[in-house]
Amino acid sequence: MSRLLQTPFLPSVSLPTKTRSSVTGFRVKPRIIPIQAKIREIFMPALSSTMTEGKIVSWVKSEGDKLNKGESVVVVESDKADMDVETFYDGYLAAIMVEEGGVAPVGSAIALLAETEDEIADAKAKASGGGGGGDSKAPPASPPTAAVEAPVSVEKKVAAAPVSIKAVAASAVHPASEGGKRIVASPYAKKLAKELKVELAGLVGSGPMGRIVAKDVEAVAAGGGVQAAVAVKEVVAAPGVELGSVVPFTTMQGAVSRNMVESLGVPTFRVGYTISTDALDALYKKIKSKGVTMTALLAKATALALAKHPVVNSSCRDGNSFVYNSSINVAVAVAIDGGLITPVLQNADKVDIYSLSRKWKELVDKARAKQLQPQEYNTGTFTLSNLGMFGVDRFDAILPPGTGAIMAVGASQPSVVATKDGRIGMKNQMQVNVTADHRVIYGADLAQFLQTLASIIEDPKDLTF
């Protein structure tokens, strides 16, 4: 869901100016300039509770463009997803202060919105008056808690805080529609394509993961756009890593890093279990044609086991108490370009396996297009991490902050086992290892949970209700 930039009226606010940084990645110097006129600042929005800074993926509008209330202005990359940001007011995009690829703290100004066309020149002059027209522009310090546009009034001077300017790393460009999948495009790009009668299918987008943005549509409409897109693809198709180079974290990698460091403060322990999967494999083969996925089956089995052992679905946040979560929301780790995200299957114990599978496919598509909404990735109460598709037979997973347990699932492999009558037989078995918060969950709790999980997987009749 696109976010609206709200605008409280303030007596005066600060405005940073463009600054020049000759070396990518260095902090730019703050400058002080006064602003006079009815001009609003467009701030970097907070797209999630954990977001501290955002990266400009693309500007949907250009300087001087007319903006209507509710219209997409910019695509922002948060710590987990890309989102279209809309304006809450009519006006003109007077000046862009953070270019595409630039990073700005939450609450800092990224552009100016002029109420009338007559104020555009004044806004541009004020924005560029303190320095040359460099490639990057610095937002101000002390970001507020919410994303807003504020009116700029007379005669208040405030220094703008520095911001790190990161180079836009070239990444592989993918067609926005492959093999009948849905077209991944910004809302404004879709609207523009309809107006300009541009066919989006097969178009190579310049956004993340091939996402089509407005400039791609405009390029095609102007002629030669398809050839230009193909040329870009040829340039970036050959992967290459510059050995010895220092690469700054992406926004998502930074968020993962902070979460992993935070998890070090939680006392954890691990319990492993071997589960036979012959019956589950047979069920999967039987209902796979109906769109059921193995991930959905594992999530469903896990949710049913959690319903019988609510302490394993609990969480401790303050170190003094814990919560028996009212919903069983199974988060599943998914590797995406440039990071890791955990889409959440909410109320997995109550949703039928067919609906759960459809929901999972939808979440994966949105995750890979970086279009997940916060409630679709930050509401998990228990996490699954599955590396079985890579042939990994056993591994440990790190506990995500704010949850009680995470289960690492290995590959199902044929194993030689002793049968009940003393003979030698073959069974498909998988290894699971659960990492848990020992402040809340104890060894016996996990052992009982894993026994229940094994019984459900080895006799999966309850998974298809």
Curated annotation (Swiss-Prot):
One of its GO terms (molecular function) is dihydrolipoyllysine-residue acetyltransferase activity. The keyword Chloroplast applies. It is found in: Plastid, Chloroplast stroma. Residues 136-148 have a biased composition (Low complexity). It is an enzyme of class 2 (transferase). The active site is at 438. The modification N6-lipoyllysine is found at residue 80. The pyruvate dehydrogenase complex catalyzes the overall conversion of pyruvate to acetyl-CoA and CO(2). It contains multiple copies of three enzymatic components: pyruvate dehydrogenase (E1), dihydrolipoamide acetyltransferase (E2) and lipoamide dehydrogenase (E3). This is Dihydrolipoyllysine-residue acetyltransferase component 5 of pyruvate dehydrogenase complex, chloroplastic. It comes from Arabidopsis thaliana. The gene is EMB3003.
